[in-house]
Regions:
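Domain-level signature for proteins that mediate thiol-based redox and metal-cofactor handling
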Residues: 1-103
Length: 103
């Protein structure tokens, strides 16, 4: 497979991932973090970093809007639910493990 075709396939898969996340607003970012150690905000950060690597200035809110398909504040108001105590405890444990691994 040539590089251009590979890039086009990767881009198509990424667009499909974004649409899947937009269609499944019931899946909360904290759920994604707990299961896969990334979330929509991570994707926005990676998107913005990729833009910066190519000399394109992009503010984080603009990257979030690309990932969420709407301004983050709007998505949060419509779809984000309060994290449960169990979810928060699990996130704290993951953070502790990450910090311990970094030392």
């Amino acid at each position: 497979m040539d590089e251009q075709t590979r890039i086009e396939l990767e881009a198509a898969a990424f667009r499909r991932l974004l649409q899947h996340l937009r269609d499944h607003t019931d899946v909360q970012n904290i759920d994604l973090m707990l299961l896969a150690d990334f979330c929509r905000n991570c994707l926005a950060k990676w998107y913005g970093a990729a833009a910066k690597e190519r000399g394109i200035e992009m503010e984080y809110p603009a990257a979030q809007e690309i990932i969420y398909g709407m301004p983050y504040a709007e998505w949060k108001a419509k779809y984000q639910k309060e994290a449960t105590p169990e979810q928060l405890k699990a996130m704290e444990e993951i953070q502790r493990r990450k910090e311990a691994a970094d030392h």
